Amino acid sequence: MSLIGSEVKPFKADAFKAGKFVTVTDDTLKGKWSVVFFYPADFTFVCPTELEDLAENYAEFQRLGVEI
């Protein structure tokens, strides 16, 4: 489900970025284009396919200034 242009509700989550765990909040992403990706569980059909596509396009997202 795409929510392009939508504001996120306040949240706080741990993420693994650049080889370390970081805390991400709605304030962290404020004013930036962002992709927030959730999946139901490991070893489901969503995990390998969509995450692989996201990883393959990561450099392009970075080039466009998008936070993932």
Curated annotation (Swiss-Prot):
Keyword terms: Antioxidant, Cytoplasm, Disulfide bond, Oxidoreductase, Peroxidase, Redox-active center
E.C. number(s) listed in UniProt: 1.11.1.26
Reactions performed catalytically: a hydroperoxide + NADH + H(+) = an alcohol + NAD(+) + H2O
Annotated Thioredoxin domain residues: 2-68
DNA damage keyword on record: no
GO MF term list: NADH-dependent peroxiredoxin activity; thioredoxin peroxidase activity
Gene3D superfamilies tied to this protein: Glutaredoxin
InterPro entries: AhpC/TSA, Peroxiredoxin, Thioredoxin-like_sf, Thioredoxin_domain
Cellular compartment(s): Cytoplasm
Signal peptide: none
Record-annotated active site: C47
Family: Belongs to the peroxiredoxin family. AhpC/Prx1 subfamily.
Role of this protein: Thiol-specific peroxidase that catalyzes the reduction of hydrogen peroxide and organic hydroperoxides to water and alcohols, respectively. Plays a role in cell protection against oxidative stress by detoxifying peroxides.
Other facts: The active site is a conserved redox-active cysteine residue, the peroxidatic cysteine (C(P)), which makes the nucleophilic attack on the peroxide substrate. The peroxide oxidizes the C(P)-SH to cysteine sulfenic acid (C(P)-SOH), which then reacts with another cysteine residue, the resolving cysteine (C(R)), to form a disulfide bridge. The disulfide is subsequently reduced by an appropriate electron donor to complete the catalytic cycle. In this typical 2-Cys peroxiredoxin, C(R) is provided by the other dimeric subunit to form an intersubunit disulfide.
Subunit structure: Homodimer; disulfide-linked, upon oxidation. 5 homodimers assemble to form a ring-like decamer.
Name of the molecule in the record: Alkyl hydroperoxide reductase C
Organism: Rhodospirillum rubrum
Gene (name only): ahpC
